[in-house]
Amino acid sequence: MNIKDLQYYVSLTQLKNFSLVAAQFHVSQPTISAAIRRLETELKTQLLIRANPHLPVALTTTGIQVQRHANQILLEHQLMCQEVAHTTTDQLVIGMPPIIEINYFPRIASQLPQALFSQIQPISQGSLAALKGLKKGQLDLAVLAYLNEFTDTTIQLTTFDTQSFSIVVPTDDPLATNSQLQFRSLRHQHFVALKDNFVHRQAFRQLSHQNHVRPTIVFESNEIGSILNMVRQHVGIALLSNAVQLPAGLQRLPLTDAQAPTFNVGVAYRHSMTFSPTQADLIQRLTAAFQSVDWHAY
């Protein structure tokens, strides 16, 4: 079975037009038609309902089955190509949220040999985006955060820190007179928040749902520095993990919610990934360095 034929077929199931698929791949329309016929001959089934050529392409029942399997085959093919390319060069493409990049990685950098840094290609992105990139093969490794429990069985995860979430306010804010807060009491407050690809937003939604409140988010960003600056300028308050280091002028108020989510951080990679000896050594060194630190001492 030809990978290119499967690529043509999957594209046809999405675009539902032979001419559009041909244009997408810069080939002739007969090339696409021939690829579909080869698949039908090999699989001994009809994949398309051939009715009015002016109507969008429709799939038979087996055509839908083949579409599902073809998507999986192409994903595995992409993973294979990316894994082989990275293993051959002994490089590690690592996804890392800005909070981890700023608040965790610098504290272990001195434990790592200088040569290691030339073998790491860091990608800055939120934890949810990093997890997706890991599963798609765009990343070899991720140092990511998750809430409560991690249940994805396709990912090997080694957790090295767990932190609580708190409310961050300016030191001169009226809320700063409290020693602790319940999230429900903040229902009329304005919040500034990290965007949806961060687990902080998941935590915000979880607490809102548990307390049956919908606080207003007046500003959102991918940059933790922007969030802290907005809080300092009294634009809004923020829900942040205790892993975030606060600059002068800001104060952390613990939450009293019994079922408040926890911010957990770990090193993750795909179970199916086979690393070169050099890559495996890099991962072992990174993981050991993260585990050697008492993160609650900071």
Regions found by a protein language model. Give the residues of each.
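Short helix-boundary/capping micro-motifs
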Residues: V10-S28
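Central regulatory/effector-binding core of bacterial HTH transcription factors
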Residues: T89-T151, E220-S221
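A short LG(V/I)-centered, amphipathic sequence patch enriched
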Residues: E40-L59
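Hydrophobic hinge/microswitch elements
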Residues: G126-A130, K135-L139, A145, V199-P254
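Secondary-structure junction motif
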Residues: Q189-N211, F275-Q279, V293, A297-Y298
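Flexible hinge/capping segments at coil-to-helix
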Residues: T154-F191
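Beta-alpha-beta core module
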Residues: D152-T158, Q163, G225-T274
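Alpha-helical linker/hinge and terminal dimerization helices associated
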Residues: E42-L43, V66-T87
